[in-house]
Design a protein with these regions (language model features):
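Catalytic machinery of carbohydrate-active enzymes
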Residues: 1-284
Length: 284
């Protein structure tokens, strides 16, 4: 949810390259960003060793501007002509994207609201083309059945029923996620009529992004894939349980969401989802 900030900075400083502090998993998402500079990896698993190494590398450079949207102390250790942190933002902003953008708007009063974006490379686009050639679909439904916690995962039985009830609107369904999501995806595909492509555990993040760019609709739990789908331009419907959609829902004009009663994702019924999709004109 930080890419709108990158786009704002690029508009203000079109000739600048932007160094970024990233974690191991998100690093690949920025490799093909056309205005990126150096990527500094933050090792969350080895904090005591990794943080001093990160600080040492950053301290060797001097910046015109340093922006920190997440931590409280890293800016103190970076040499920069100007520094902006969370305290420069609008405390009343609700969504994380709006809060992040409010930090850098102090630079030029820019009121533009950029969408999140992704930069898949040529190899990622070719991979997506090869995979989707298997289903030869004009209208693809993408499903992400997993999440990073069991309490965020909608029942595979509900996903299966939902797909069967809306399958007239699609030619195929592609399932995306990690390798641990694959058994759930197999349960779903075992009982559906649509031609299915189970790619759980078979893609990198950018390969998944390239596939999501072809989706006619994305439906998934509260996970990173929902944010990627919205950034790729797909209409999205995210199912929330204990999360905070007002702060962390996918960002985009065609991104909708539902929250289960009492913050329980499995209190969302299939009927609830279909009504919500129809209300938001995401079904034909």
């Amino acid at each position: 949810m930080t890419t709108p900030v990158l786009q704002t900075l690029h508009r203000i400083y079109p000739r600048a390259v932007i160094d970024m502090v990233v974690d191991k998993r998100s690093r690949d998402l920025f490799v093909h960003c056309p205005y990126r500079g150096e990527l500094f990896e933050k090792d969350k698993q080895a904090f005591m060793r990794g943080f001093p190494r990160l600080v040492f590398r950053l301290a060797r450079k001097r910046y015109r501007l340093a922006v920190d949207l997440r931590t409280d102390g890293l800016l103190c250790l970076i040499r920069a002509g100007k520094k902006l942190g969370k305290w420069n933002g609008d405390a009343s902003a609700t969504h994380a994207v709006e809060k992040h953008l409010s930090v850098v708007r102090t630079l030029a009063g820019d009121k533009s609201v950029y969408h999140c974006c992704l930069w898949p490379g040529d190899e990622d686009l070719s991979f997506a083309g090869r995979m989707l050639e298997q289903v030869k679909s004009k209208k693809t439904l993408c499903i992400a059945p997993g999440a990073n916690a069991a309490k965020k995962i909608w029942s595979w039985k509900s996903f299966r029923e939902l797909i069967n009830r809306i399958d007239r609107d699609f030619d195929s369904v592609v399932l995306l996620g990690s390798r641990r999501d694959r058994p759930i995806a197999e349960e779903i595909t075992a009982g559906i009529n649509l031609q299915a492509l189970n790619l759980c555990g078979e893609t990198s993040l950018l390969q998944a992004a390239a596939i999501l760019a072809h989706a006619s609709l994305f439906i998934g739990n509260d996970s990173g894939l929902g944010h990627m789908a919205a950034a790729a331009g797909a209409p999205t419907c995210t199912l929330f349980g204990p999360g905070q959609p007002e702060k962390y829902r996918p960002w985009g004009d065609a991104a909708v969401w539902l929250t289960g009663r009492n913050r329980q994702v499995n209190d969302i019924s299939v009927d609830d989802v279909i009504r919500h999709l129809e209300l938001n004109r995401l079904l034909a």
